[in-house]
Amino acid sequence: MKQIPSVDLGDFLSVDTNKRNEFIQNIGKAYEDIGFVALKGHFLDQDLVDELYAQVREFFSLPYETKSKYEVQGLAGQRGYTSFGKEHAKGRTTGDLKEFFHFGQHEPPTNGEKYPENVLVDESPAFNAVGQKTFAALEKTGCFVLRALALHLGLDEHYFDPFIKGGNSILRAIHYPPITEEPKEAERAAAHGDINLITLLMGAQGRGLQVKNHQGEWIDAIAEDDELVINVGDMLSRHTNNKLKSTIHRVVNPPKSAWHSSRYSIPFFMHPVSDMKLDVLPHCIDKNHPKRFEDITAGEFLEERLRDLGLRK
């Protein structure tokens, strides 16, 4: 496969059974083949997108001394600001060429889950507000994607609903600053797989994001202006015994002629509640597909991966 498939969530939301079933088949096949799709028909409107990017640019343009006030020790980067070069890919020690800011759930979950409070930026109330609105729109979109995948897997359509309601999801605003000197080995984001169930990515409209296909080739993952890129994370891959693929991807450094440019990218990492069991689904195991993963909860898996990323000591 040389490019990621495109699907329209409007087909799944349609009253037309044929369109709905075609969406389920197409997204399921894409996630079995390459683990990525470009999705249109989501719940983000363009005005919200424009406001979000304006506020993200404004925040990252603040002096480091101001931004660093929002880097809270002891949170493993799960809320607020994480400074440049602090996070690295699993199995690497060289930090990625990025800084980022995390938003989590804005209301305390009613299911008893306890998460760190969001870090509010005093200098920009609008940044806090647009983050909350974007979180809600992407969470809603992700819910319907998971409903389609549940049906593809032969599960009840609402199988994932109780696990993602009040889940430990994170909206991450990323700034890849201009490159000022030849990187020795660092990339904007080194090759990695995502931790969570699914990731919904804004900002894949230009070259930079690459996906490794089954032939071991790196292909560009480029979306249209009205599309999100959505990929399978390691939690969902484990749960389905790798039937749905968590594909390795990276953000490569631009050509030298574009070093002076910043890049902004905004992924939404959809996490379940921490006590969700990621045990392999029984009907994803057979003699040709033996169980590949040990039993673990989402919370245990997250802690393990935060240590791998250098965010938890």
Language-model features and meaning:
Residues 1-313:
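Peripheral, non-catalytic segments flanking oxidoreductase cores
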